From Swiss-Prot:
PANTHER family: QUINOLINATE SYNTHASE, CHLOROPLASTIC (PTHR30573:SF0), QUINOLINATE SYNTHETASE A (PTHR30573). The gene is nadA. It is an enzyme of class 2 (transferase). This is Quinolinate synthase. Coiled coil: none annotated. It comes from the Bacteria. InterPro entries: NadA, NadA_sf, Quinolinate_synth_A_type3. It catalyses: iminosuccinate + dihydroxyacetone phosphate = quinolinate + phosphate + 2 H2O + H(+). SUPFAM superfamilies: NadA-like.
């Protein structure tokens, strides 16, 4: 657990009785508590959540959308965030001090966010400054810890989403000659390449060996990518695309930019979760789509569009395992403890970290 968080769990593990309750009984109790608490309770649910959880969300969206919606809701005392840890952190930083953000299962982390910790990042910045001097600006994907957002805030940088990455990267290059992009190398590479920066002007910082990997002239490096990735989107391959092209050549292929450069380059379309949802929504009836993103979302899109032929780009894809930590039993547990006047798994980010992280968030929000 990060020292930047102050968590007050009543119990650290889900009580046994929730394992023996029927789905019907759990759903009934959630509805009862939601009705009883009314506007004092707000449940945001990420697109990648299970249907058993999403059915109770008061808003569905990507991580930043949900944090903003939570921040605009001044009536809710309790925000039970159905997503992963960094999302709940962002919600806590953007909401008021008297609003309480709860994560139903503290094990719901994000492997990509965990690939850049603050000690590694501070060390990397020091080493890169020796190489490049005061020519760099940091940008972090919102899929990062509060500490990394704060690092970017105090070093003149900002956050980005997969929807606005191009705008924010363009802005960053008006501030400095070089960009340090973390923690997702793939989103950084795909975005900067789309903006015209060649691959040989990009380097990768490996935080485990404290080394810079590059092929071109070091003096010409414009982008330094953190060696991190999404464990879900990493599993989509060019071979998957080749199989679809061979077996169903009339199928459109659309992927998330967290996929690697080779997969994005071989696809027909690439964009954020919202972009993918909107594209399928607007597509004509009878159209065919292979989607390269998280499986819970793909399955939901399939259910919502029976008039279209939709498959996962990778037929053996699994849902995001950490996102799947949030399930109906954990949601009910969180709600019942609130009902009893208790609080579990409260997310509370350190005040100074919040101030610096909000700087980075606001630099983005002011420009998009």
């Amino acid at each position: 657990m990060s020292i930047l968080e102050k968590v007050q769990p009543i119990e650290t593990m889900l009580p046994e009785r929730y394992y023996t309750m029927s789905t019907e009984d759990m759903e009934k109790r959630v509805r009862e508590i939601k009705e009883k608490m009314g506007e004092t309770l707000f449940i945001p649910g990420h697109h990648y959540q299970k249907d058993e959880v999403v059915q109770f969300s008061d808003a569905a969206g990507d991580s930043l959308q949900l944090a903003q919606v939570a921040a605009s809701n001044k009536k809710a005392k309790y925000i039970v965030f159905c997503g992963v840890h960094f999302m709940a952190e962002t919600a806590d930083m953007l909401t008021t001090d008297d609003q309480i953000v709860i994560l139903p299962d503290m094990r719901a982390g994000c492997s990509m966010a965990d690939m850049a910790d603050i000690e590694q990042t501070e060390r990397a910045w020091k080493e890169l400054t020796k190489l490049f001097g005061d020519t760099m600006i940091p940008l972090t994907y919102v899929n990062s810890t509060a500490a990394i957002k704060a690092f970017c805030g105090r070093n003149g940088g900002a956050t980005v989403t997969s929807s606005n990455a191009k705008q924010m990267v363009s802005w960053a290059f008006t501030q400095k000659e070089r960009l340090v992009f973390l923690p997702d190398q793939h989103l950084g590479r795909n975005t900067t390449y789309d903006l015209g920066i060649p691959l040989d002007k990009m380097a990768v910082w490996d935080p485990y060996t404290d080394s810079l990997e590059y092929e071109g002239d070091i003096e010409e490096i414009q982008v330094i990518l953190w060696k991190g990735h999404c464990s879900v989107h990493q599993n989509f391959t060019v071979k998957n695309i080749e199989n679809v092209r061979k077996n169903q050549p009339d199928m459109n292929i659309i992927v998330h930019p967290e996929c690697c450069y080779e997969v994005v380059a071989a696809s027909d379309y690439a964009g954020s979760t919202k972009y993918i949802i909107d594209m399928i929504e607007a597509a004509p009836s009878g159209s065919k789509w292979a989607i390269g993103t998280e499986m819970n979302l793909v399955n939901r899109i399939i259910q919502q569009h029976p008039d279209k032929e939709i498959v996962s780009l990778n037929p053996f894809m699994c849902p995001c395992l950490t996102m799947n930590r949030i399930d109906l039993p954990h949601l009910l547990w969180a709600l019942e403890t609130i009902e009893k006047g208790e609080e579990i798994n409260v997310i509370s980010v350190d005040k100074q970290v919040t101030e610096e992280a909000v700087l980075a968030l606001n630099r983005m929000l002011e420009r998009v």
